[in-house]
Amino acid sequence: MTSAFLNLTMAFTLSLLGTFMFRSHLMSTLLCLEGMMLSLFVMTSTSTLNSNSMISMTIPITILVFAACEAAVGLALLVKISNTYGTDYVQNLNLLQC
């Protein structure tokens, strides 16, 4: 295992732990999710460059699409909660009744 792959794995793990630890605010949870998606994107991009498979070339682009969708939905929820309640607490998600 190379040191770059180890660093990316640690970045993913720290973002995952941050998601579990900082659950009270939606903004910090969204930032941790973006860190996870960024580390996944870089890991798949580097592994795609090392392999010569044409099928695996689309995986990093697919991860970017999912990251963009996750960011859009997360920011829409953040705006809705902030406008309605004035705070970005995750406990307010239950009150939206979506």
Swiss-Prot record:
Signal sequence range: none
Main location: mitochondrion
Gene3D superfamilies membership: 1.10.287.3510
Domain of life: Eukaryota
Catalysed reaction equations from the record: a ubiquinone + NADH + 5 H(+)(in) = a ubiquinol + NAD(+) + 4 H(+)(out)
Record localization: Mitochondrion inner membrane
EC main group: translocase
Classification via InterPro entries: NADH_UbQ_OxRdtase_chain4L/K, NUOK/Mnh_C1-like
An individual GO BP term: ATP synthesis coupled electron transport
GO MF term list: NADH dehydrogenase (ubiquinone) activity
EC number per UniProt: 7.1.1.2
Transmembrane segments: 2-22, 26-46, 59-79
Key words of the record: Electron transport, Membrane, Mitochondrion, Mitochondrion inner membrane, NAD, Respiratory chain, Translocase, Transmembrane, Transmembrane helix, Transport, Ubiquinone
Family annotation (Pfam families): Oxidored_q2 (PF00420)
Cellular component annotations (GO), alphabetically ordered: mitochondrial inner membrane; respiratory chain complex I
Membrane protein topology class: Multi-pass membrane protein
PANTHER family named in the record: NADH-UBIQUINONE OXIDOREDUCTASE CHAIN 4L, NADH-UBIQUINONE OXIDOREDUCTASE SUBUNIT ND4L
Family stated for the protein in its record: Belongs to the complex I subunit 4L family.
Function, in words: Core subunit of the mitochondrial membrane respiratory chain NADH dehydrogenase (Complex I) which catalyzes electron transfer from NADH through the respiratory chain, using ubiquinone as an electron acceptor. Part of the enzyme membrane arm which is embedded in the lipid bilayer and involved in proton translocation.
Subunit structure: Core subunit of respiratory chain NADH dehydrogenase (Complex I) which is composed of 45 different subunits.
Protein's name in the database: NADH-ubiquinone oxidoreductase chain 4L
Organism per entry: Rattus norvegicus (Rat)
Lineage: Eukaryota, Metazoa, Chordata, Craniata, Vertebrata
Gene: Mt-nd4l
